[in-house]
Amino acid sequence: MRIEVIKREENVLEFYLEGEDHTFANLLNEVLHENEHVTFAGYTIEHPVLMARKPKFRVVTDGKITPEQVLEEAAQKIFDRARAVLEAWKEVLGE
């Protein structure tokens, strides 16, 4: 995964999420929408064949926190949820 910033303003961030597809992009988008300071979050895949693994995101906040802060919080939430799934599986497997 690599992030390529396209546009950065005080409360707007546009970037490509290289190496990912709808699977991770949709998860990130859903978690971004959970943040009360996000006024818009969405992504597109500009060409389904040529850019299938390069979603383009746009994140807009209310200005109380930056889009970068929102993304950091979202990444931590995704990490925490993945850890919870791992722990639940370990419990089921008796590990």
Curated annotation (Swiss-Prot):
- InterPro entries the record matches: RBP11-like (IPR036603), RBP11-like_dimer (IPR009025), RNA_pol_Rpb11_13-16kDa_CS (IPR008193), Rpo11-like (IPR022905)
Which keywords belong to this entry? Cytoplasm, DNA-directed RNA polymerase, Nucleotidyltransferase, Transcription, Transferase
- PANTHER family per the UniProt record, alphabetical: DNA-DIRECTED RNA POLYMERASE I,II,III, DNA-DIRECTED RNA POLYMERASES I AND III SUBUNIT RPAC2
Instruction: Mention any one GO cellular component term assigned to this protein in its UniProt record.
Output: DNA-directed RNA polymerase complex
| Superkingdom field | Archaea
Tell me which EC number(s) this protein carries: 2.7.7.6
- What family is it from? Belongs to the archaeal Rpo11/eukaryotic RPB11/RPC19 RNA polymerase subunit family.
Question: What is known about what this protein does?
Answer: DNA-dependent RNA polymerase (RNAP) catalyzes the transcription of DNA into RNA using the four ribonucleoside triphosphates as substrates.
Name the UniProt record assigns to this protein: DNA-directed RNA polymerase subunit Rpo11
GO biological process: any one? DNA-templated transcription
- What SUPFAM superfamilies does the database record attribute to this sequence? RBP11-like subunits of RNA polymerase (SSF55257)
Give the first-level EC class, as a single word: transferase
**CDD domains to which the protein is assigned, alphabetical:** RNAP_L
Pfam families registered for this protein in UniProt: RNA_pol_L_2
Question: Where is this gene product found?
Answer: Cytoplasm
